[in-house]
Amino acid sequence: MSDFKVPPKAKGFKRLFKALFYSKDGLKCAWAEESAFRQIVILALFCIVLASYLTKDFLEWGLLILPCFLSVVIELINSSIEKAVDFTGTEFHPLAKKAKDMASSAQLIGLIFWAFIWGRYLLTLYFN
C-alpha cells in the first residue's frame, strides 16, 4: 500500500479556501501535463479577445465565449478520466478504451459546437 494519507476534511470557509487551492493544483497539472489542454486554452483566450473586438453587446460576447469555456471544461474532464483510467492499470482493457474514447468524443462534440457557433457568427458578420 502507498504512504499517501488523505488529509482531514475541513469545514466552512476553510473548506472553500482549500478547494480553491486543489482547483489551482488541478489547473497547474493539466497545463503542465496535457498538451491538448494547453492548445484549447490558448485557442479559447484568442477567441475571447477576438470576441471582445467583434461583438456589439454583452449578450453576443457571452454567446461567443460560451463554447470556449465549455471546451476547456470538457478537456479537464477528459484529461481526468484518462488519468483515472491510466491509474487503474497499464494493461489494455476494452472498457478502459471505451471510457477514454467516450471522453474524447465529448471533446469532439464541444469543438464542433465551438466551430458551428463561431462559423455562423463570422458568416453573418461577413454577409451583413
UniProtKB/Swiss-Prot annotation:
PANTHER family in the cross-refs: DIACYLGLYCEROL KINASE (PTHR34299:SF1)
- Which family would the database say this protein is a member of? Belongs to the bacterial diacylglycerol kinase family.
Q: What is this protein called?
A: Diacylglycerol kinase
Segments crossing the lipid bilayer: 35-55, 58-78, 108-128
CDD domains on file: DAGK_IM
- Keywords recorded for this protein, A-Z: ATP-binding, Cell inner membrane, Cell membrane, Kinase, Lipid biosynthesis, Lipid metabolism, Magnesium, Membrane, Metal-binding, Nucleotide-binding, Phospholipid biosynthesis, Phospholipid metabolism, Transferase, Transmembrane, Transmembrane helix
> Which cofactor is essential here?
Mg(2+)
Q: What is its EC number?
A: 2.7.1.107
Q: Which GO terms describe its molecular function?
A: ATP binding; ATP-dependent diacylglycerol kinase activity; metal ion binding
Keyword Methyltransferase among UniProt keywords? no
Q: Where does it live in the cell?
A: Cell inner membrane
Q: Quick one: which residues bind a divalent metal cation?
A: 34, 82
GO terms under biological process = phosphatidic acid biosynthetic process
Reaction(s) catalyzed by this protein?
Answer: a 1,2-diacyl-sn-glycerol + ATP = a 1,2-diacyl-sn-glycero-3-phosphate + ADP + H(+)
Q: Which organism is it from?
A: Helicobacter pylori (strain J99 / ATCC 700824) (Campylobacter pylori J99)
Any one GO CC term of the record: plasma membrane
- In the UniProt entry, which residues are flagged as the active site? 75 (proton acceptor)
Just give the chief location class: membrane
- Domain of life, per the record? Bacteria
Where are the disulfide bridges? none
The record's function comment reads: Catalyzes the ATP-dependent phosphorylation of sn-l,2-diacylglycerol (DAG) to phosphatidic acid. Involved in the recycling of diacylglycerol produced as a by-product during membrane-derived oligosaccharide (MDO) biosynthesis.
User: What membrane topology is annotated for this entry?
Assistant: Multi-pass membrane protein
